Amino acid sequence: MPLIIVEGSRKSGKTYLVQNQDVYPVFKFPFNEVFSKWNPGRESKDTHWMGLGKEIMLHELYNQSQLKEETLIVDRGILTNSVWGVFQKRIPLEQAIDDLIKFSEMGLLDNVIFLRIEGTWNESREKDIWDGDDVRIGEERHLFTQFSSLLQDLGHKVVVYPNHFDGESLKRFILTLKNI
């Protein structure tokens, strides 16, 4: 069974789509809570390593059949860690690319499907400590596109899903999941 990782920039509707489907169970690492508790720093390399460590553990558990019993959806994953590593100046672009290549070479992305959500909710919101970065969504989106292309070049499946923030988008999302 595949591991489905739902990725995309802030305000693309990822979490809404994931929470409103009942096809597969969902795992969402409580990054904001963990970050706030330990507070390694927004631009700290430690923040990148914390996220990367979580990703390595998740993918190793999956590869060792601990999680392969059924399809699992992960709300944000290795692409987000790489994008935000560069976006928040925690790591250089070259390191993010190298991290993704290493993940691929280690087989950590075998039988993984990336579902990258595209769309932007234009309403203002107060969600978390990262709200101030919403003005840079274009930059974030560019990095998601760049890293998704790299994963495709490495032979991994990336499905781009347009979210129009309507009931039809949710229906199509559920149908997409059922067809994976």
For every predicted segment, state its role.
Residues 16-66:
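Conserved substrate/cofactor phosphate-moiety recognition/catalytic segment
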Residues 88-147:
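A glycine- and Lys/Arg-enriched "phosphate-lid" helix/loop adjacent to the NTP-binding pocket
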Residues 13:
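Conserved glycine(s) of the Walker
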Residues 1-3:
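Pre-Walker A (Motif I) flank of P-loop NTPase domains
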Residues 10:
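The conserved Walker
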Residues 6:
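Hydrophobic anchor at the beta1->P-loop junction of P-loop NTPases
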Residues 131-180:
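NTP-dependent small-molecule kinase module
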Residues 48-107:
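Glycine-rich phosphate-binding loop used to anchor ATP phosphates in small-molecule kinases
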